[in-house]
């Protein structure tokens, strides 16, 4: 009897795991198709200047924290006292429908700076009729652009990295174990995974050191934070307005 129960539990867990994997693949595929369709129906150029970033952002409505949808505040834990204090003076960009696939810096899109969570999936489920809040400090986008420009200036691949964390609302930040006062919550930080920056066909420590050097000396300097995370290909940088450096992820 115990053996049958154990086998039953194992089979149940296998089905649950398979279902979770299938669901994850569904959303990834849906995201890919929507992005492909957007590119087929819209003409976009690489966003290569601060003025171009400003022009794109100006097209979206800016919503003050006090006027955010109560359901959004509750769903994202942004209404909790500690976060209300952090966010009360912030303005969010209201991104309609498939405009999340709009290029915002280089060839990276607004979508790349958004959390891949239930809130995003609800938006993705009904792109024609939904809008999505995005909190971002434009200075972060300018720093991102400057990183790309410096890489290109020095003869390196300017887009050989992947964004895996941008804006994180409080609930998502808590779910993934982020710091309670993370700069991601304020839309001031981005995490990237380094690829083949120097074009030698490999992704190695040398590639990461190139990016870190440019961020440390030119892009961020004393104006922001830099998470170096030794032993990984990950880098964090932010525009907090003062110098901060750390190694532990």
Residues covered by each model-derived region:
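Extended, low-complexity, intrinsically disordered C-terminal regulatory tails
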Residues: 144-177
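Extracytoplasmic cell-surface/polysaccharide-interacting catalytic and binding patches
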Residues: 22-144, 241-249
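N-terminal Sec-pathway targeting helices
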Residues: 1-16
